[in-house]
Amino acid sequence: MKLAFICTEKLPAPAVRGGAIQMMIDGVTPYFSSRYDLTIFSIEDPSLPKRETKDGVHYIHLPKEHYREAVAEELRASSFDLIHVFNRPLNVSLYKKASPNSKIVLSLHNEMFSEKKMTFAQGKEVLDNVSMITTVSEFIKQTVIERFPEAEDITKVVYSGVDLNSYPPVWTMKGSAVRKTYRKKYGIEDKKVILFAGRLSPTKGPHLLIHSMRRILQQHPDAVLVIAGGKWFSDDSENQYVTYLRTLALPYRDHIIFTKFIPADDIPNLFLMADVFVCSSQWNEPLARVNYEAMAAGTPLITTNRGGNGEVVKHEVTGLVIDSYNKPSSFAKAIDRAFTDQELMNKMTKNARKHVEALFTFTHAAKRLNTVYQSVLTPKNKQFPPPFLTQNFDLSSINQLFVKAKT
């Protein structure tokens, strides 16, 4: 079977510039390349050839300008059984016209069906041209069916995942060695390390962590905040917000480190060097993949109860979940707890790692996607298994897992 992945026009695949979608694609590609004739379309990048076949995968990199039209031309010249469009519903109709005999699966990684993103008529047209929609969280699924109730039967949650081999938990010999190496690299061997990793954007909330440092340092004068990321993935240039962050950090210059952009393959090492990771999202986060990463690394996790974050992180079971997400004092209080309540942190991190091992690896994500593909290609099989396919979990059983972990 011929399968096509169509990335967005934002970042290239493979994920040489980072990006949650691109990292997910990289993660599931080995599974699908061993089962299908897989072609991946993405934008050009100076570090990547225009076309190549690598590890059995055909990569086609097209100019960012007129990208969607260039993809459509490629589709016209090919014959794919199934086309997976990532996070660009408004491109679906164009691709369907270019390849009318192909089945189309659309995956949503943001609130792409909102009134701000498309008209009601455009949404109807998308639904007319897709065979199935997948979403990265129940939260995103609800944003679709609240506006388009008729989409409920074709909209399925497919959670993302991580590569466990890249995240040896901190309590293992390998994880401990990485932790020691990276703490030495940044000169923080004897510090209490708070980690933020992500785009430097107001919606991600790093400014709140800087604001919280005054209170944190009163209680923990050896604390250090490591802010890893740039204004736009691999773009380390400064904008007004980044300048604001640096100015805000000046009073704590000996306690805040800006690493700038970190390549995707180096991200796991930062999680291992941290004593606590904070996902300070202010917007309705679809479901931040950093939550999976922290849990996989066995790093104590603090996240905000925004969007889909609370679907995979349960308060005091696999992490600390903050409801008062826009208050520096809330972060300071949670971070203090992470530093002082070691019994709870040890319990949560072990639970979190088991949680990821059971449900949130890239193999789990790929198998869930494959079930979607097979249901599309084999219409008679209308029964769609629950999101947690490989262990026969459903939502009630995952809640039972949390209850069991908490007792």
Curated annotation (Swiss-Prot):
Q: Could you identify this protein by its name?
A: Putative glycosyltransferase YtcC
Short name of any one Pfam family annotated for the protein: Glycos_transf_1
Family note: Belongs to the glycosyltransferase group 1 family. Glycosyltransferase 4 subfamily.
One MF annotation (Gene Ontology) recorded for this entry: glycosyltransferase activity
Q: Which GO terms describe its biological process?
A: biosynthetic process
Keywords attached to this entry: Glycosyltransferase, Transferase
Its EC top class is transferase
Q: Which InterPro entries match?
A: Glyco_trans_1, Glyco_trans_4-like_N
Oxidoreductase as a keyword of this entry, yes or no, is: no
Q: What EC number is given for this enzyme?
A: 2.4.-.-
Species annotation:
Bacillus subtilis (strain 168)
